[in-house]
Every structure is written in C-alpha cells, then in structure tokens.
Curated annotation (Swiss-Prot):
Belongs to the major facilitator superfamily. SotB (TC 2.A.1.2) family. This is Probable sugar efflux transporter. Keywords: Cell inner membrane, Cell membrane, Membrane, Sugar transport, Transmembrane, Transmembrane helix, Transport. GO terms for molecular function: carbohydrate transmembrane transporter activity. It comes from Pseudomonas savastanoi pv. phaseolicola (strain 1448A / Race 6). The chain crosses the membrane at residues 14-34, 51-71, 84-104, 110-130, 137-157, 171-191, 213-233, 249-269, 276-296, 300-320, 334-354, 361-381.
Length: 402
C-alpha cells in the first residue's frame, strides 16, 4: 500500500527533526577540519595555518554561491531539491576520503560547499513552514540543536575517529551517515512546493530595509571575530594552553554542549527580550575572546570560558536568523541565502584572519584580535538598537508597498 506524503498544513515535528539531523551533518562537515588541521597537515606536509585556508575557501564558495544557487533552484520542489543536494554531498565526501593531494581535497570541499549553499538557503524557512502551528520558534531551536550537536558530537567524534583511523575515515563516515539522512528526509518531509522564495527582483526591496542591512553587517563583523579564534582552537589549546589531544577533544565537546544550552536560552527569552538577548550575546562573546589568552593557563577557567562562549555564539546566530526571517517574510529564501552567504564570509574571513595572526603574531593572539573586532560589533549593535528602536518588521514591509 502506497502512503501519501505527510500533510504540510498539519505540521510535522518528524520533518523538523529530519531537517535538524541534516543540519547536524552539514555543520559537522564544515567545521570538522578544525579538529583535524594537524592530521591533514601531516598527510600533505603542511602547517595547520596553511591547511586552515581550506576553511576560508569552503566558506567563501558558500558565500559567493548561496544567492545564485538559490535563484537557480527557486522553482524546484523542496524535498526533491534536498535529495539532489545530499547526492552531491555524499559524492564529494567520497572524493575527500580518497584525495591523493591537497588540491583534490580542496576540489571535493568546493563540491560540498555548493551543496551547503543550497541547503542553508532554504532550511530555516522550511523548518518554520512545516512546524506545528505556533511552534515556529521551537522549530528554529530544534534546528539549532542539530547545529549544536555537530559541535558536541560531530566535531569531537570526527577528531577521535581521525586520530584513531586517519582523517580520511572521518570524511567517509560522514558520507555514510549522510546517505541515511537522505532516506529519512524522503520519508519525513511532505511535498514542499517552492513558496515565497523570491527572485532577483526581491533584492532592491530587501536592500531598502535598513534593519535588515544592519543585521547583515553585524553578522559579518561578529562571525569574523568568532572564527578568528575558533578556527584555530586546536593549535591554541595544544601549543598555548599545553593541553593534551584528549583534553582538546573534551573542550570541543564542552563548546558544543554549551551551544545546546544557548539554543534553550534563545527559545525561552527571544520573544520577550530580543534586543537585550542580542546585545548580551555579543557582549559576552567579546569578553570571552579577550579573556582567551589570560585564562589559557588554567584548564578549569578555560573550560568555563568555553561554556559561556558556546552559549553566546549560539544565541547570537539564532537571534539574527530569526530576525532575518521576520524582516523578509515576502522573500525568505533570498533573504536567508544572503544571510548564509554573509555568515560564511565571516567564517572565511575569520579563518583567514586567524591564519594571518597565527603566522605573524602567533596563535596565542587570535582571541585578542577576534575580541577587538567583536567589540566593534557590540558598538554597532548598541547603535542600531537605539537608532531603530523596537523592531516592527511587519510595519516596515507594509510601508514599502505603499
């Protein structure tokens, strides 16, 4: 007996869960090299700072291709689109696992980045769309939990597997799990015709929304600040803090677990204190980055800082994602494609800046440089919050139509 697809209107936690699991896979593969920089470098006789450029290339391909790929696929039914995306994802990971050179590894990562560009352009809006009525914030929180679990389980387990069996095994394992996720998505998601995806004609309208432009600028600054330090947390903990490989893995676990706590905080307070939550998150992140070096010699203090840091960056990312969706309800996919692209500009910029700092000033200073940049983001956030006052996205959208 053939069963019909789930009913989109009824809302589906299973569908949201499937998207969260897919988010787990995508975030695992984007950031798992952070825990494997040294291992990959040994295979190709490169330094961690040189290998770290693969993070920059990946992120910048995503940033450049998010909008073009979203526009190219805007009329494709979303469930079918996700099947194609994961097909490319799996094939590219197999290529990563058998790469005979760093250049081929980069080519495989570009293929994964193309899949990433499409996935994150549509996923947040899909999660909101298929969530049970009145549960949109919780759906975003569950999606964020998938992201956090990538930090809690994906990256540390990828590091453990890479150290035990080689980094190639890590990428092969990701390909296998992704193949299972494809099956779950096919079973759990309803048919999802493209809806409110927008087009190139949406861009001038979005660019006329100053609140949205401020969010994009803030995203670029703060994400760059964060990844200036986080991209090189493995060499930092091992060379500056003098922690063992096992302790470094535990620290990555702690960071990811804190991200889950951050998503819970977002779910509880985002509706009541949107501005306060955002300012607090950026301020906390700034302090954590600036204190990274001073506290690096005390494992307990460094662990505590890592917990606070993980909560702060998760609250920041979720708050901005929710605001983008609320400020562009008429072109959600275009707006989220821009957000994903700009977020990845920050990831790539942070990885590049961290590489420069590591090479010229020493890896010990990545937190200081990132913290100073985050301080600028905090100033921008305070200014825009005061300037725009209470955010009323619906009123802004209605004003544009007059």
């Amino acid at each position: 007996m053939i069963t019909s697809p789930p009913n989109e209107q009824a809302g589906s936690w299973l569908g949201v869960f499937a998207l969260a699991l897919a988010a787990f896979i995508f975030n695992t593969t984007e950031f798992v090299p952070i825990g494997l920089l040294s291992n990959i470098g040994q295979s190709f006789e490169m330094t961690p700072a040189q290998v770290g450029l693969m993070l920059t290339i990946y992120a910048w391909v995503v940033s450049l291709m998010s909008l073009p790929m979203m526009l190219a696929t805007r009329n494709i039914e979303r469930r079918k689109l996700l099947m194609f995306v994961f097909g490319l994802f799996v094939v590219s990971h197999v290529l990563s696992a058998i790469s005979p050179s760093f250049a081929i590894l980069l080519v495989s990562r570009v293929g994964i980045a193309f899949a990433h560009a499409v996935f994150w352009s549509v996923t947040a809006s899909l999660a909101v769309r298929i969530a049970p009525p009145g549960k949109q914030v919780q759906a975003l929180g569950l999606l964020a939990t998938g992201t956090s679990l990538a930090m809690v389980l994906g990256i540390p387990l990828g590091r453990v597997l890479g150290e035990a069996l080689g980094w190639r095994t890590t990428f092969l394992g990701i390909a296998g799990i992704a193949a299972l996720v494809v099956f779950l998505l096919a079973r759990a998601l309803p048919l999802l015709p493209s809806q409110n995806s927008g087009s190139l004609r949406s861009l001038p309208i979005l660019f006329k929304r100053p609140r949205l432009m401020a969010i994009y600028l803030l995203t670029a600054i703060v994400v760059t600040a964060h990844f200036t330090a986080y991209s090189y947390i493995e060499p930092f903990t091992q060379t500056v803090s003098r922690l063992s490989g096992e302790m470094t893995t535990i620290l990555l676990l702690v960071f990811g677990g804190a991200g889950i706590m951050g998503s819970i905080i977002f779910s509880l307070f985002s509706d009541r204190f949107p501005n306060g939550l955002l300012i607090t998150a950026i301020g906390t992140l700034t302090v954590c980055l600036l204190m990274l070096l001073p506290l690096s010699g005390d494992a307990t203090a460094l662990g505590t800082l890592t917990i606070i840091w993980g909560m702060a960056i998760m609250c920041f990312g979720l708050t901005l994602q929710a605001r983008v969706l609320s400020l562009a309800p008429d072109a959600t996919d275009v707006a989220m494609a821009l957000f994903s692209g700009i977020f990845n500009i920050g990831i790539g910029g942070g990885a590049l800046l961290g590489s420069v700092v590591s090479s010229h000033l020493g890896v010990a200073n990545v937190g200081i440089v990132g913290g100073l940049l985050a301080l600028g983001g905090l100033g921008l956030c305070c200014f825009t919050t005061h300037y725009f006052g209470k955010i009323q996205p619906a009123a802004e959208v209605q004003a544009e139509s007059k």
